[in-house]
Amino acid sequence: MNHFPKLLSSQIGFDVAQTILENFDRHYRIFREAAVEAKDLFERADWHGLQRLARERITSYDDRVRECVELLEDEYDAENIDNEVWPQIKLHYIGLLTSHRQPECAETFFNSVCCKILHRAYFNNDFIFVRPAISTEYIENDEPAAKPTYRAYYPGSEGLAATLERIVTNFQLNPPFEDLERDIACIMQAIHDEFGAFDEAVNFQIHVLSSLFYRNKTAYVVGRIINGDRVLPFAVPIRHARAGILALDTVLLRRDQLKIIFSFSHSYFLVDMNVPSAYVQFLRSIMPGKPKAEIYTSVGLQKQGKNLFYRDLLHHLSHSSDRFIVAPGIKGLVMLVFTLPSFPYVFKMIKDHFPPPKDTTREQIMAKYLLVKRHDRLGRMADTLEYSSVALPLARLDDALVRELEKEVPSLIEYEGENLVIKHLYIERRMVPLNLYLQNGSDAEIEHGVREYGNAVKELMQANIFPGDMLYKNFGVTRHGRVVFYDYDEIEYLTDCNVRRVPPPRNDEDEMSGEPWYTVGPHDIFPETYAPFLLGDPRVREHFLAHHADFFDPQLWQDSKDRLLRGELPDFFAYEPALRFCIRYPERFAPGDAADGGKLAAA
């Protein structure tokens, strides 16, 4: 039976709610300013500046939460606010959000602040937003000068080519295009190649999100074509063809291609969104089946994505009955990994003790994971969600897993009634371990896996990442067939490594020895020594040497390091370079146009 609610009588309750919302609004203003700055940096081709901006934005949320907590403690002695007041704070906050344009993100910010203040009381659902209180349906910015979430274009009156040109020019990028008419013709040809000639239905139209999506050296136009009952997604990457000159690089017309550029293995986009829920709804319409949590994360709202993921997990637990088990495969020396078979993620915990030869600490491993979070992942390193105080029902934990937890991570678990509380863990997308993929694959799959592995490591080294442990078991194969690195405890910056050749043996005894006859420093790497570990399977060896014979040559690694030390940033593509217009339709490009490209890498 529900009781008549008490009056909201606490002035402190209202003041605290208003203070939290003011701090969220400041956070989101800074978030949007970063996207505006990204446009300027892109136009000026300031790639180092874009990298810096992306790193700073990742840490911005935690900085704003910390500032808000400090303010509440100074102004209201927040830790000692009476428990009867906190529900009033929440209700006042809900009232303040009724016409807000980012209510879901503001609720998550409220939870983050409360977690810092209330500590274990976080589990009191009356104090926080376990479920959303404010609907995000049909939110739109109706201010006169505001951009709509997306713009609708109707090609029937002016023709498709003219409409596509207007779509591009409406973004008002400062640098001129090398040959926009040529690029539009390439888009028209690509659409014809993909779909053939199609009749224009009475509702034929194109919807384009009003803001560009910035990442690495690319700005993406994202939209959908509506024709009859068909919804056709598309993305058009805009790049610098040369200094101060832009070009449309390709058009991506398949959902799988869009899912890859928005995948968990890429860094977050910088995109200006006044109503983020409307952007997410649009993106889900062109990538159905992609979780909202992943989309929020990919557009830079990783805390909102993390919040939604946890809700998805709780929802899944309430609608499933299988048990968490130790993850199959080779056990790691540093991490304990478990999974729920019906849920496509793995849960990773840092062990309390590491056997030799591992020489590291929990703090060092956490620093490695933070490094990856802030680094440009290029589609080759899995993103991780980091959680504290996660309560899992004991009844859903396999007995063997409980024994493993008690043995390997006793400092990280606590029993609370019918729950096991995990103090700290990482969560990643579940992938097929590359060693199992190669072990069980057909000849074509082995060739694909080996080619992808070599490409992944080469792209990582160009991005200043040395994986450390090169074994296949530390890499996974995604649903889209891409090889991604996911074991970070030995990761280093390539520029911190000393690339060395193996010195020749001094005598026969050296040559027969199983131990190195030369000194090895802590940051020395010897690419020649990787071959015995990677080429043991004759089938793998054949394809590896066919595609990546240079992999074991120290000069390849040294050249990448030298370019990094000179401040060079190579070109990476979140799609196959073969899709680029300059490669796909070379007859349309004059010598010296965007096709000069230089060294390419698919990321």
Swiss-Prot record:
The active site is at 383. InterPro entries: AceK_kinase, AceK_regulatory, Isocitrate_DH_AceK. It catalyses: L-seryl-[isocitrate dehydrogenase] + ATP = O-phospho-L-seryl-[isocitrate dehydrogenase] + ADP + H(+). GO terms for biological process: glucose metabolic process; glyoxylate cycle; tricarboxylic acid cycle. It holds the Pfam family AceK_regulatory. Its main location: cytoplasm. ATP binds at residues 327-333, 348. It comes from the Bacteria. Keywords: ATP-binding, Cytoplasm, Glyoxylate bypass, Hydrolase, Kinase, Nucleotide-binding, Protein phosphatase, Serine/threonine-protein kinase, Transferase, Tricarboxylic acid cycle. One of its GO terms (cellular component) is cytoplasm. Its EC number is 2.7.11.5, 3.1.3.-. One of its GO terms (molecular function) is [isocitrate dehydrogenase (NADP+)] kinase activity. This is Isocitrate dehydrogenase kinase/phosphatase. It comes from Burkholderia mallei (strain ATCC 23344).
